[in-house]
């Protein structure tokens, strides 16, 4: 965009109208002008002046905004900002913003449990961000955390479901919903699924029992008739166990996790699960508050003996 000859008002208006187009700006000036130096440039004395792409500077503030959104678990919004930067910054700045955009897309997909797709995007971003991290401490810390996350992600993908690793991922996801977004109904829904997954994984790994298709002879005789009556599907005749029945079977088989569940069930879990069942994302109309989530979260870590340090953390962006 050439704004030669424009008044100050015209030049500012032109810049404002074109800034979103990622334009470069030029101006024809010169060392010698008519009218004692205040008129037009004398023929043959013209000089072209080129200004840098303004988006190279605008992107710095956009990057900060994207970092804030990412740290609040608003991954899609952060990705939209970075995608805009990729399209508009100068060529030499594109690799960094493109890699950052790929990384954010990867974590957005992971947050939706799309692990295979997340892995592809995170690996695409890793090498470029590693190179930038050699000169930028903030980027280096992001890469270090991403490497740790990728190691965990690889294990999730390698391990058949249900698994204890998948449970850890659900717990971390619930923690993000509650701690970063304050979406306690969503958090409790994920937390409930993590409690269920724990039982499913323990029954599968320790006793070879699939809760979606339990074999009759794997059910202790004391529970067999009741389980056939209550949990056998009329459509396909498979025995399918919900959360409570899974833990009851686990306890009856001598599983430590099942015993731990029932040690706190009456006093802690039962009233909390009742509130969950009446929540808007389950079977009722009541919203869940922070206190209920935290109690259920703490009780889950308590009976499962899962320490906070085992819950993965996504990177914190300070770019």
Q: Where would I find each of the regions flagged by the language model?
A:
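Long, low-complexity, Lys/Arg-enriched
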Residues: 9-319
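Short glycine-rich phosphate-binding loop at a beta-alpha junction
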Residues: 2-4
């Amino acid at each position: 965009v050439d704004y030669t000859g424009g008044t100050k008002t015209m030049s500012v208006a032109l810049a404002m109208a074109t800034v979103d187009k990622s334009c470069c700006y030029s101006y024809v000036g010169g060392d010698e002008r008519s009218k004692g130096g205040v008129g037009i440039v004398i023929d043959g004395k013209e000089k072209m002046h080129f200004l840098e792409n303004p988006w190279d500077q605008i992107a710095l503030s956009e990057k900060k905004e994207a970092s804030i959104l990412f740290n609040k678990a608003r991954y899609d919004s952060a990705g939209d900002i970075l995608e805009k930067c990729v399209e508009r910054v100068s060529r030499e700045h594109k690799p960094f913003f493109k890699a950052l955009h790929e990384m954010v897309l990867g974590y957005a997909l992971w947050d939706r449990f799309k692990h295979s797709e997340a892995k592809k995007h995170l690996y695409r971003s890793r090498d470029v961000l590693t190179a930038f991290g050699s000169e930028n401490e903030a980027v280096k810390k992001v890469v270090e955390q991403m490497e740790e996350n990728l190691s965990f992600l690889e294990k999730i993908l390698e391990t058949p479901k249900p698994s204890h690793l998948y449970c850890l991922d659900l717990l971390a996801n619930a923690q993000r919903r509650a701690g970063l977004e304050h979406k306690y109904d969503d958090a409790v829904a994920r937390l409930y699924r993590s409690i269920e997954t724990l039982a499913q994984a323990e029954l599968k790994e320790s006793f070879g029992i699939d809760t979606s298709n339990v074999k009759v002879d794997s059910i202790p005789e004391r529970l067999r008739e009741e389980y056939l009556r209550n949990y056998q599907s009329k459509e396909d005749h498979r025995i399918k166990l919900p959360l409570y029945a899974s833990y009851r079977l686990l306890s009856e088989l001598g599983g430590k996790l099942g015993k731990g569940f029932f040690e706190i069930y009456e006093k802690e879990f039962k009233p909390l699960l009742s509130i969950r069942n009446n929540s808007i994302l389950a079977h009722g109309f009541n919203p869940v508050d922070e206190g209920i989530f935290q109690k259920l979260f703490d009780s889950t870590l308590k009976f499962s003996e899962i320490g906070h340090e085992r819950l993965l953390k996504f990177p914190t962006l300070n770019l």
